[in-house]
């Protein structure tokens, strides 16, 4: 049972329309297991209230996570951002008024752990904050990156942003045969069946864990990384930024299943 007192530190996740978020469950469990006197709350904030709320939270919170749709908006309120957050143009973790992108760290490390051979051609579906983090991870792994997005204008804006940092990505309208497919959209069905090929499929959707995309990858014998793996890894990366320590991914996943918070 959490006991709140004058020394209890405040953490939380800031987004809009996020009643589904598992972040409070994950981090409050981690605080308890790590012996940290802190509480983690959900801040579901409308766009017209964002400015006043973020200023208030940055003054009173010891650390924050940021999710849809504010990962890019929050950057201008910070003193500084890490190299990966600067290139990606999106922040999902804040500590001491500095911004980080643990989505990128999680995706990069999980792909590196899953693949033996260096990937060459990779396709990302989605050009939002998660798409940007995925693209940067693939670029740092040595991939030639192709992007498919419903909004051509947004995809071209992303292409321009990465080019400013010396990275070339290509916008395409249909799948290109390659090593890795990443779904960075909220809908795993956005990836056509004919695209599910290669060495690895990554789906950032985490509930259900076994999305249609992950199930199809497993059926065809392709290795996969599901959204829950990414969610938990990025959360533990945030814990390491805040406290210099974290739980194992396996323990957190086991906790979420035991509490029936994922299926």
Swiss-Prot record:
Disulfide bonds: none annotated. It holds the Pfam family Shikimate_dh_N. GO terms for molecular function: shikimate 3-dehydrogenase (NADP+) activity. It catalyses: shikimate + NADP(+) = 3-dehydroshikimate + NADPH + H(+). It is an enzyme of class 1 (oxidoreductase). SUPFAM superfamilies: Aminoacid dehydrogenase-like, N-terminal domain (SSF53223), NAD(P)-binding Rossmann-fold domains (SSF51735). Shikimate binds at residues 21-23, 67, 92, 103, 206. Keywords: Amino-acid biosynthesis, Aromatic amino acid biosynthesis, NADP, Oxidoreductase. Its EC number is 1.1.1.25. One of its GO terms (biological process) is chorismate biosynthetic process. NADP(+) binds at residues 83, 126-130, 204, 227. CDD domains: NAD_bind_Shikimate_DH. It comes from the Archaea. InterPro entries: Aminoacid_DH-like_N_sf (IPR046346), NAD(P)-bd_dom_sf (IPR036291), Shikimate_DH-bd_N (IPR013708), Shikimate_DH_fam (IPR022893), Shikm_DH/Glu-tRNA_Rdtase (IPR006151). Pathway: Metabolic intermediate biosynthesis; chorismate biosynthesis; chorismate from D-erythrose 4-phosphate and phosphoenolpyruvate: step 4/7. The active site is at 71 (proton acceptor). Belongs to the shikimate dehydrogenase family. Involved in the biosynthesis of the chorismate, which leads to the biosynthesis of aromatic amino acids. Catalyzes the reversible NADPH linked reduction of 3-dehydroshikimate (DHSA) to yield shikimate (SA). Homodimer. PANTHER family: BIFUNCTIONAL 3-DEHYDROQUINATE DEHYDRATASE_SHIKIMATE DEHYDROGENASE, CHLOROPLASTIC, SHIKIMATE DEHYDROGENASE. This is Shikimate dehydrogenase (NADP(+)).
């Amino acid at each position: 049972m959490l006991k709140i007192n004058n020394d209890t530190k405040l953490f939380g996740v800031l987004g809009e329309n996020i009643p589904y978020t598992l972040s409070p469950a994950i981090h409050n469990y981690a605080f308890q297991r790590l012996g940290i006197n802190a509480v983690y709350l959900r801040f579901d904030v409308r766009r017209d209230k964002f400015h006043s709320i973020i200023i208030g939270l940055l003054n009173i919170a010891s650390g924050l996570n940021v999710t849809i749709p504010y990962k890019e908006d929050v950057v201008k309120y910070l003193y500084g951002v890490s190299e990966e957050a600067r290139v990606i143009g999106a922040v999902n973790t804040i500590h001491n008024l500095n911004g980080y992108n643990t989505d990128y760290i999680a995706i990069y490390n999980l792909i590196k752990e899953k693949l033996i051979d260096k990937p060459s051609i990779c396709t990302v579906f989605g050009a939002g904050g998660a798409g940007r983090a995925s693209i940067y991870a693939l670029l740092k792994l040595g991939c030639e990156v192709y992007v498919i997005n419903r909004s051509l204008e947004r995809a071209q804006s992303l292409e321009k942003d990465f080019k400013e940092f010396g990275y070339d990505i290509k916008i395409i309208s249909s799948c290109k045969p390659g090593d890795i497919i990443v779904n960075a959209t909220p809908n795993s069905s956005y990836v056509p069946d004919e695209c599910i090929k290669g060495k690895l499929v990554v789906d950032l959707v985490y509930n259900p864990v076994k999305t249609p995309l992950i199930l199809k990858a497993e059926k065809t014998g392709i290795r996969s990384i599901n959204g829950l793996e990414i969610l938990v890894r990025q959360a533990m990366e945030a814990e390491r930024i805040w406290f210099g320590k974290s739980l194992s991914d396996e323990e957190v996943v086991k906790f979420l299943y035991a509490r029936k918070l994922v299926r």
